[in-house]
From Swiss-Prot:
<dbReference type="GO" id="GO:0019029">
    <property type="term" value="C:helical viral capsid"/>
</dbReference>
<keyword id="KW-0472">Membrane</keyword>
<keyword id="KW-1133">Transmembrane helix</keyword>
<dbReference type="Pfam" id="PF05356">
    <property type="entry name" value="Phage_Coat_B"/>
</dbReference>
<dbReference type="InterPro" id="IPR008020">
    <property type="entry name" value="G8P"/>
</dbReference>
<keyword id="KW-1030">Host cell inner membrane</keyword>
<keyword id="KW-0946">Virion</keyword>
<comment type="function">
    <text>Self assembles to form a helical capsid wrapping up the viral genomic DNA. The capsid displays a filamentous structure with a length of 760-1950 nm and a width of 6-8 nm. The virion assembly and budding take place at the host inner membrane.</text>
</comment>
<keyword id="KW-0167">Capsid protein</keyword>
<comment type="subunit">
    <text>Homomultimerizes. There are several thousand copies of this protein in the phage capsid.</text>
</comment>
<keyword id="KW-1032">Host cell membrane</keyword>
<keyword id="KW-0812">Transmembrane</keyword>
<feature type="topological domain" description="Periplasmic">
    <location>
        <begin position="1"/>
        <end position="18"/>
    </location>
</feature>
<dbReference type="GO" id="GO:0016020">
    <property type="term" value="C:membrane"/>
</dbReference>
<dbReference type="GO" id="GO:0020002">
    <property type="term" value="C:host cell plasma membrane"/>
</dbReference>
<keyword id="KW-1139">Helical capsid protein</keyword>
<feature type="topological domain" description="Cytoplasmic">
    <location>
        <begin position="40"/>
        <end position="44"/>
    </location>
</feature>
Length: 44
């Protein structure tokens, strides 16, 4: 039973790291899109 709990804890830690990475990528992508829209608004 202890090894199952350890395995689940390890998997949750890995998933949490993946979620953090994906969240950061989404924020960066949104910032880039907003920057491009702002630059376009300056010229048009």
């Amino acid at each position: 039973m202890q090894s199952v709990i350890t395995d689940v804890t390890g998997q949750l830690t890995a998933v949490q790291a993946d979620i953090t990475t994906i969240g950061g990528a989404i924020i960066v992508l949104a910032a880039v899109v907003l920057g491009i829209r702002w630059i376009k608004a300056q010229f048009f």
